[in-house]
UniProtKB/Swiss-Prot annotation:
Pfam families: SPOUT_MTase. S-adenosyl-L-methionine binds at G100, L119, G120, P121, M122, T123, W124. Specifically methylates the pseudouridine at position 1915 (m3Psi1915) in 23S rRNA. The gene is rlmH. It comes from Granulibacter bethesdensis (strain ATCC BAA-1260 / CGDNIH1). This is Ribosomal RNA large subunit methyltransferase H. Keywords: Cytoplasm, Methyltransferase, rRNA processing, S-adenosyl-L-methionine, Transferase.
Length: 157
């Protein structure tokens, strides 16, 4: 059986449009994608970073594949992400995607990561990263199963 996938993210999405969009894709994923939400810290920028970093690292299971979502990470096209996702599925460990808050991820989280991925060079609100990631993981699953959701190449126009 494939180990579960998990998002560990700063911020609460309760009842938001972002949550509805996230659920739309997360519900289609196999293995299931679960979310652990970390409360957004308050205080100075340094204090926020320290507290959120500590909480994110504390939420990790002892053994897992850690994927940090960070602007400075490597951006993959959908086919390359599908290849990575297939490799992760072949492992007996759960995959944990780490998403920081408005201040991003600090170096200790990036150092703990096995992979650092980016959704591209643009900056995204941290609450939008979850639905974007869920959609890309669903797309990777569609590529792996030859589902028509993903259309290879660019549309002609």
């Amino acid at each position: 059986m494939t180990a579960p996938w998990r998002i560990i993210a700063v911020g609460r999405m309760r009842g938001s449009e972002e949550e509805a969009l996230f659920q739309r894709y997360a519900a289609r994923l196999r293995p299931a994608l679960t979310v652990t939400e970390i409360a957004e810290a308050r205080g100075s920028t340094a204090e926020i970073r320290r507290r959120e970093t500590s909480a994110l690292l504390a939420a990790l299971p002892p053994a897992c594949i850690v994927v940090a979502m960070d602007l400075g990470g490597r951006a993959h096209d959908s086919e390359a992400l599908a290849t990575l996702a297939r490799r992760w599925r072949e492992q007996p460990l759960p995959v944990c995607f780490m998403i920081g808050g408005a201040e991003g991820l600090e170096q200790p989280v990036l150092d703990r990561a096995d992979h650092v991925l980016s959704l591209g060079p643009m900056t995204w609100p941290h609450l939008l990263v979850r639905p974007l990631l869920a959609e890309q993981l669903y797309r990777a699953q569609a590529i792996a199963t030859n589902h028509p959701y993903h259309r290879t190449g660019r549309p002609s126009g």
